[in-house]
């Protein structure tokens, strides 16, 4: 399966913040596609104002979301590649740029 940074996928891995299949954003570098895991930030439909650690994404033709959702940048995790679906949408370059701001803050980069 070919995934790219910025893709929106469904993750079906159980974890502290993923009790059910949920949409997530692929944030891992495209150069690391050979890894057995994929680094993602989950999305949540329960919206809270907490920028830059929550990035609001409005539904669009590009992302195929059904409702406004927040990318939970502070819930960054690696999941097994076989628990990740094919991409159902993508973020715009501007939206991904906002996620990058949150990642730099979270990781002190």
Label for each model-derived stretch:
Residues 1-109:
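Conserved functional hotspots at enzyme active or ligand-binding sites that engage polyanionic ligands
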């Amino acid at each position: 399966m070919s995934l790219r940074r910025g893709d929106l996928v469904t993750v079906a891995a159980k974890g502290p913040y993923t009790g059910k299949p949920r949409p997530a954003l692929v944030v891992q570098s495209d150069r690391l596609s050979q890894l057995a895991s994929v680094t993602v930030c989950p999305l949540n439909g329960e919206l809270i104002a907490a920028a830059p650690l929550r990035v609001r994404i409005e539904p669009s033709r590009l992302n195929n979301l059904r409702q406004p959702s927040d990318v939970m940048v502070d819930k960054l995790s690696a999941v097994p590649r076989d628990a990740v679906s094919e991409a159902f949408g993508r973020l715009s370059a501007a939206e991904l740029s906002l996620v990058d701001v949150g990642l730099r803050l979270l990781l002190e980069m």
